[in-house]
Every structure is written in C-alpha cells, then in structure tokens.
Amino acid sequence: MNKKYDIAVVIGRFEPFHNIHKQLVDKALELGEKVVLLLGTAKVAPDPKNPFTVDFRTAMIQSCYHGEDRKRLNFNGLRDKPYNEALWLAEAQNIIREYQDDIIIEKNIEYTDVTYHAALGQVKVALVGYEKDNTSYYIHKFPQWTLEHFNGNTPEGKVLNATDIRKMYFEDDRYEHLVPPEVGTLLHSFKSTQTYIDLKQEYSFTKQYKADTRFVNAPYDPIFNTTDAVLVCNGHVLLVKRGFNPGRGLWALPGGFLQSDLWILDNAIKELREETKIKVSSERLRNSLKGFHVFEYPYRSFRDVVVMMRLEQDGFQYLHCQIMKISSLKTTLK
C-alpha cells in the first residue's frame, strides 16, 4: 500500500453518518495509509441534536466498510471545549500524536529528545476537511497538518445537512435515501430503543415550545436565561433528576429560568431551595458563594447562567437529593 499520507484525519459529529460523510471517509481512505476519525461532541447526554453515542456512531461508520478498509479506520471521541478552543485543539493534536508515535516505531525512525519533533515531521499527516459552513472554520486551525479539501454535494448539487436528516428521523419522514443502506438499518433498529422514544418526545416538546405564539411573532429570537447552582461538598456535587422535558430522566444541576424581577444570585438560591428542599438558609447560601460563570455558547439549548457555590463540610447532612462524587461523573457518559 502506497498512499500519499501516513495518516488521514477526519473530524466530524456524524449524527447520523450520511452519504456525503461516506464520500469524505472514502477520500480519506484514498489518501492515508491509516484513517483516524475524531468523533466530536463525545460524552454528552443524548438530545435531539446529538442523539448518538461515540460507540453507535463508530458502528454506523464501520458498517459501511469491510476487509482491509475497515481495519484501516481508527476511532476516537473528541469532547467539545466551546469555552477553551486551545484545549480542544491540543486534545485533537495529542490524539493524532499517539498515532504518529506508533508510526515512528513501525518505521524504525531513530530520534532523541532533541530530535523528536523532527521525527514527527517524517510522519505525513493530512486533515481531510469539508468546508460546509461557518462551523467548519476549525479545519484551518491545524497548520502542522496538510489540508486536503473535500467538496461533497448531492447529485443535485445540494449540500446534505445532518440537521435535516435528524428532523426527518424524528418526524417519521423518509430519510433512507440520504444515508448508506447499512446506516439505514442501524437507524431503523435504534427506533425500537427507549432512548429513541425519549428523544422523539423531547424533539416534539421542543418543536412545540418554539412554535408558541408568544415567541413566533417576536421581533428578535427569544433568549431564555437560567440560573443553576453548583453546590459542592467534600468532592461531591448535588444533582436533581429532571422530571420533564427537555432532558427528562437525566441528572441535572438544580436551577430554573431567571425571573425578570430577581437578581441572578437570588434566583439561583430560590431555585436551589425550591427544587432540593435544602434546609440551609438563603443567607448562609449567599455567604457560601465562591463565584459564578456565564455559559453563553450559542448552540446550547438555552443560554445558561451558572452560579457556583460551596458549602461547609457538613452541608449535605440536610439534603434530600442525590449527591454524586465529582470523579464518578467522568465515567457516566460514553
């Protein structure tokens, strides 16, 4: 096998993996001895925008390939870092560097600590990028890799958007012609799962919510602010389970919508006490404040204002809600 590059990198969410995505991976297989797919938005709770786990997305892509091509595909989850792009870039680079290290060993490239970066330079890496819209700007953020542009359109010359396919999927429209047959089979099977049933209910809830006449005729898109309290004690965090959509059944921070007549901190304390029935005074909670942060990533479901608090070590003896070790939260999503 004599390919132009040692590694061809493809970055995407693939929710779901559709026909143009397959063309993208096909091109990567033409260019690289080894293809590394970085599956974005990894380890998040499922919602109608990101319904599939990394494992399921991997299965969708693998189902489309066989033999040697399938063996050449390598999959890694890549978590979003919307408030720290440098960290996101570093994580992607570190994943690829591990593959570069393997190839250095395979090729018996000798190096010392001083010449290590020169050795890395002998491993040819390309990013196969699909510049679909303004969300694809990241493909220009890896100058150390050669950028191989991919221009994929449908036979009619249109851009195929996974957002439209998800809409068809949750509204029971025909989408099968837009995805590889193997993916269509997996998506059909997924419809029988409880996860799909819950997501479809959430999709319908959100669609109806957005269609509310109070917002349809507004001169500007409505922005809904919420205040959520992060209450920490002895390495544990206080969580509540959502009883309604969106996110019914998921663990969440206690909080709610910001009332127009309340300060942010007052609203956070009010919601915390109402949702958890915590037997700690508002004054004590206010005095326990360690800081707050605004999370305004525009692709969040809503614009959230998260107020962070920390109680004394005995703070949880009065709680009637679930507390979890912070360290355990890292392993709950796959």
Predicted features by range, described:
Residues 148-150, 313-334:
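NUDIX/MutT-family hydrolases
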